[in-house]
Regions:
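Conserved H-X4-D acyltransferase segment
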Residues: 1-16
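A short secondary-structure junction signal
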Residues: 4-8, 28-32, 77-80
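Membrane-interfacial amphipathic helices and adjacent loop/beta segments
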Residues: 17-48
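Short glycine-enriched loops at secondary-structure junctions
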Residues: 1, 22-24, 111-116
Length: 182
């Protein structure tokens, strides 16, 4: 929710958006959009994310776009595995791919709570170089997940454990890949 409220706190010449997956129920989707857009932010449907970010860049519009990757990718969306909390874990790579395509600077923000309704978000640069200049062996995605793990260990009450990051195993994924190639 903090991404949706950023326009309330920062300069009006900076657009703020968050990536979201439209809900199947149109009434709930409308309600969700109304609540998330009430402070002036923009909900960007996942399927049009790259197009919208390219449009913002083309028009030289400064923007902060929130990518949240707290869930497990579907089988057909798994393109990368990384070590996360001592387990091989499938992860989304959209932030890295889009960041490279549009020359974006990418930050990571920890979510912690000082007291009721106060959530300081210390933003940290993941890499000092734009992501496209990072050596191949140093994937942005692999730099991001250890930070989440550290934050989860320090503040487990803020992580959505219900999302079950490990419901998809690498062995099952490899088996499915082999079946598809037959």
């Amino acid at each position: 929710e903090w991404i949706a409220s950023l326009p309330y706190w920062i300069s009006k010449d900076i657009s703020c958006g968050q990536i979201y997956h439209p809900l199947y129920n149109q009434a709930f989707d409308k309600l969700f959009l109304r609540l998330r857009n009430q402070f002036g932010g923009e909900c960007i449907p996942m399927k049009t994310t790259l197009r919208r970010i390219i449009e913002l860049k083309r028009t030289k519009q400064k923007a902060i776009i929130g990518f949240i990757s707290d869930q497990a990718p579907k089988w057909n969306s798994i393109h990368h595995w990384t070590e996360f909390l001592n387990q091989e874990t499938p992860v989304f790579i959209g932030t890295e791919k889009i960041g490279k395509q549009v020359d974006a600077l990418i930050y990571y923000a920890d979510v912690t709570r000082v007291k009721r309704r106060i959530l300081p978000l210390p933003a940290q640069t993941i890499v000092r170089h734009p992501p496209w200049q990072v050596p191949r062996f140093l994937k942005l995605t692999d730099l991001f997940h250890p930070r989440i793990g550290t934050n989860n260990k320090a503040h487990p009450q803020y992580w959505l454990w219900s999302h079950n990051r490990w419901k998809r195993t690498k062995e099952e994924w490899l088996r499915r890949q082999q079946e598809e190639t037959k």
